[in-house]
């Protein structure tokens, strides 16, 4: 099976099935010298894990991450970082009826058709549980960026569930409110309506779709490449890889369909400059000025597939979860019968509340990959000091050799 890797220099490779022993990933391309905190990665995993509220699946997974490689004394060494998350609460019995009677709108039939077999417990590899690996990798990327010379900040919140749409919120409102409610919405009033709506569908044995708004700040200008490695192309791959995503928008997105060229085009002006004109400069000489800057940001921080330095923003849309208790119809290819089925496993009635950290993680992974590709961050070492070996993150020699050591080193008197 291919398609298990994402990224060019910062590369994520994942493994695991929903009801297997464990989930895991290998992250390569992490520069040496990053002080990596397992606890910080865990914080993001806790935001994604199941069982957080009454509108999430009741599956009791602690999602505890364990870093297995790539660290020495708490610092990255430049070698691949391996992480494992054990599955603790898998119950595959309820999925046995669907081995040859595929659930509607799932990957059951298509996986069997492609490979001639599949891991059927909990959906196996096609389950959204696999995104736990992405959040772990995003936690690594987030820490690399936080310790770099760039102040990259990324935040997302649920902007719509069903027909309940949140008001536009500021960056500060997202930071203040989105983690204060079960649906992770930056608009507290809309959050209550969204919560009630999700609860209503859950009680009816049904589900509902929704959307997430995201914003990236501090991304420097000049990242991305024309055509197939453009920022929109790579972000689109990242977002459409998330299970159940049906739409991805940048900037004003679908509203561009009704905008005229004169409305959508943004003029250029000089931004503010930190520099000032010389005290003795004559009035005829040009004064210090800032860099060219677009007037407005309908383009979402990207022009020609390359970043402008303005905030990158957009929306991601999910269809309703297709596992729910209401009766559905399918066919059993082994018996040749039509069957009525009820999917009674533990499932979310709406996906965006738990998908917020997934979106943020994939944004962090994508932005860091472009920063490495663009030379903004040294891919070998974070301190960008090639050839220097006596660093504050290099392991120190022991003061005394262990008594049972087979080898030893003693100081030589140079006199």
Swiss-Prot record:
Its EC number is 4.2.3.5. Residues 43-72, 262-310, 379-415 are annotated as: Disordered. Residues 379-393 have a biased composition (Basic and acidic residues). Pathway: Metabolic intermediate biosynthesis; chorismate biosynthesis; chorismate from D-erythrose 4-phosphate and phosphoenolpyruvate: step 7/7. Residues 298-307 have a biased composition (Gly residues). One of its GO terms (biological process) is aromatic amino acid family biosynthetic process. Reduced FMN (FMNH(2)). NADP(+) binds at residue 48. One of its GO terms (cellular component) is cytosol. Belongs to the chorismate synthase family. NCBIfam families: aroC (TIGR00033), PRK05382.1 (NF003793). This is Chorismate synthase. It comes from Halomicrobium mukohataei (strain ATCC 700874 / DSM 12286 / JCM 9738 / NCIMB 13541).
């Amino acid at each position: 099976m291919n398609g298990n890797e994402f990224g060019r220099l910062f590369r994520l490779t994942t493994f695991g099935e929903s009801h297997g022993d464990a989930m895991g990933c290998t992250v390569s391309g992490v520069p040496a010298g990053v002080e990596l905190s397992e606890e910080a990665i865990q914080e993001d995993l806790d935001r994604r894990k199941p069982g957080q509220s009454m509108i999430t699946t009741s599956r009791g997974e602690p999602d505890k991450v364990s870093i297995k490689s790539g660290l020495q004394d708490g610092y990255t060494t430049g070698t691949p970082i391996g992480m494992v998350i054990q599955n603790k609460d898998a119950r595959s019995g309820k999925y046995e009826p669907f081995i040859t009677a595929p659930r509607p709108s799932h990957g059951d039939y298509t996986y069997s058709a492609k490979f001639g077999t599949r891991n059927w417990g909990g959906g196996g590899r096609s389950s959204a549980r696999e995104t736990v690996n992405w959040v772990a990798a995003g936690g690594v990327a987030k820490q690399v960026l936080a310790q770099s010379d760039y102040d990259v900040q990324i935040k997302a919140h649920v902007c719509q569930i069903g027909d309940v749409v949140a008001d536009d919120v500021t960056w500060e409102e997202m930071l203040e409110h989105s983690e204060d409610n079960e649906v992770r919405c930056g608009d507290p009033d809309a959050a209550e309506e969204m919560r009630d709506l999700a609860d209503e569908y859950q009680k009816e044995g049904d589900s509902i779709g929704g959307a997430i708004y995201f914003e990236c700040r501090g991304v420097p200008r000049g990242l991305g490449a024309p055509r197939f490695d453009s920022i929109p192309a790579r972000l689109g791959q990242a977002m459409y890889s998330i299970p159940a995503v049906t739409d991805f928008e940048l900037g004003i997105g679908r509203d561009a369909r009704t905008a005229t060229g004169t409305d959508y085009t943004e003029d250029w002006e000089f931004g503010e400059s930190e520099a000032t004109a010389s005290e003795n400069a004559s009035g005829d000489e040009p004064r210090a000025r800032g860099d060219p800057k677009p007037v407005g940001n309908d383009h979402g921080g990207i022009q020609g597939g390359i970043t402008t330095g303005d905030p990158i923003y957009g929306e991601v849309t999910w269809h309703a979860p297709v596992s729910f208790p209401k009766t559905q119809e399918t066919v059993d290819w082994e018996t040749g019968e039509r069957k009525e089925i009820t999917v009674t496993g533990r499932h979310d009635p709406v996906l965006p509340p738990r998908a917020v950290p997934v979106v943020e993680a994939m944004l962090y992974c994508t932005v860091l990959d472009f920063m490495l590709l663009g030379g903004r961050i040294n891919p070998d070492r974070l301190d960008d000091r090639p050839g220097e070996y006596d660093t504050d993150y290099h392991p120190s020699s022991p003061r005394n050799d262990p008594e049972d050591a087979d080898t030893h080193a003693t100081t030589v008197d140079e006199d």
